[in-house]
Amino acid sequence: MTLLTTWPESGPETVVRRTSDPAEIAAALAPLGVRYEQWPVRADVPADADSDTVFAAYGPEIDRLNAEEGFTTVDVLGLHPSDDPEYPVKAKAARAKFLQEHTHDDDDEVRFFVSGSGIFYLHVNGEVHAVYCEKGDLLGVPRGTTHWFDMGTRPAFTAIRFFHEEDGWIGSFTGSTIASRFPDYDTIHAGHVGSAA
């Protein structure tokens, strides 16, 4: 279940908002220019599906979003626990790349979760909004929005990424250490999954 938690940027001691209601999440994010919607989940798509399988399953949704937003490049990014001895190294490097606060000057950051989960932290208007996204969630973060993404210490997700530019993901890092002051993916995931049980 998707979860939105909002705190003051000063720290996570006070929770301003916490909701799993999709309509409330969309309404809270819309004034920030953030697009949130849920797409139908394709039960026949394996968690670690390859790009061709994902594109075939979500073709109509991808085409609709490309037509609405003018995206020119779409790809699939996935990372899943494995017995490969390189997995821990790859997972750590992938997590570190996105975990520091950054912006995108030339493109929005739009992701659809085919499987698994991850958290986008949006640092906007004096608040930090942690959006715990999971299978079926589409999140569009407008260019220029300060944010970071945490996939956890054992990433397990597949996501469709949408770009206006062929260069793909290019982050402009702020140098802020704010991400270290807020609960990380592992902490939020453990509490969220535990509370849903």
UniProtKB/Swiss-Prot annotation:
Ni(2+) binds at H102, H104, E109, H147. It catalyses: 1,2-dihydroxy-5-(methylsulfanyl)pent-1-en-3-one + O2 = 3-(methylsulfanyl)propanoate + CO + formate + 2 H(+); 1,2-dihydroxy-5-(methylsulfanyl)pent-1-en-3-one + O2 = 4-methylsulfanyl-2-oxobutanoate + formate + 2 H(+). The keyword Nucleus does not apply. GO terms for molecular function: acireductone dioxygenase (Ni2+-requiring) activity; acireductone dioxygenase [iron(II)-requiring] activity; iron ion binding; nickel cation binding. Keywords: Amino-acid biosynthesis, Dioxygenase, Iron, Metal-binding, Methionine biosynthesis, Nickel, Oxidoreductase. Pathway: Amino-acid biosynthesis; L-methionine biosynthesis via salvage pathway; L-methionine from S-methyl-5-thio-alpha-D-ribose 1-phosphate: step 5/6. The keyword Iron applies. This is Acireductone dioxygenase. It comes from Streptomyces avermitilis (strain ATCC 31267 / DSM 46492 / JCM 5070 / NBRC 14893 / NCIMB 12804 / NRRL 8165 / MA-4680). The lineage of its organism: Bacteria, Bacillati, Actinomycetota, Actinomycetes, Kitasatosporales. The gene is mtnD.
